[in-house]
From Swiss-Prot:
InterPro entries documented for this protein: Scorpion_toxin-like_sf (IPR036574), Scorpion_toxinS_Cl_inh (IPR007958)
CC terms in the record's Gene Ontology section: extracellular region
Its biological purpose: Toxin with unknown function in healthy organisms. On glioma cells, interacts with chloride channels (probably ClC-3/CLCN3) and MMP2 at the surface of glioma cells. This complex is then internalized via caveolae, thus inhibiting the chloride channels necessary for cell shrinkage and tumor propagation.
Family: Belongs to the short scorpion toxin superfamily. Chloride channel inhibitor family.
Annotated protein name in UniProt: Toxin Lqh 8/6
Keyword list, A-Z: Chloride channel impairing toxin, Disulfide bond, Ion channel impairing toxin, Knottin, Secreted, Toxin, Voltage-gated chloride channel impairing toxin
Presence of keyword Disulfide bond: yes
Amino acid sequence: RCSPCFTTDQQMTKKCYDCCGGKGKGKCYGPQCICAPY
């Protein structure tokens, strides 16, 4: 499960991406990363 995310974090996109296993893109919809195959 992803750690809490913050839209103010410049690295959040990468963190969510890594959290989602690098598949598709992990996007931050505070307060959590959403793993969607965009």
